[in-house]
Amino acid sequence: MRTTSLGKSAASSRRRTIAYWITTVLLALECVVGGMMGALHYHLYVRNMEHLGYPLYFMTILGVWYLLAGVALLAPRFPRLKEWAYAGLVFNYTGAVASHVAVGDGVMTLVGPITFTALAVASWALRPSTRRLDHDI
């Protein structure tokens, strides 16, 4: 039985869609859980923010933004809003890396934010055409 190039293309498209949804759901879950923990000032997050030198009210702001980003990533339509959510998450995760480096934390503290940066970039790169902007910005 021969597989046509059309069959390979459809299989590739299906794998890409599955990879998109896996990365996006994982990212959105992190946003919702992390957002709630930040907005509600979960004690481990409080300790981390104090260690990094940030004011605690910043947790509420970031927590709400995280929740909104998680909803935006999963919601149908609104491709521009999704672009903003992805950008905000990348800014946040790379900012977390910079903050941990600035206070002299070890390499292991960078694994989480680097992993989530990669997840955000992967989700963004894999998104289907229905979730992309129709034109260049």
Task: Give the location of each predicted region.
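Membrane-interface extramembranous regions
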Residues: R2-I137
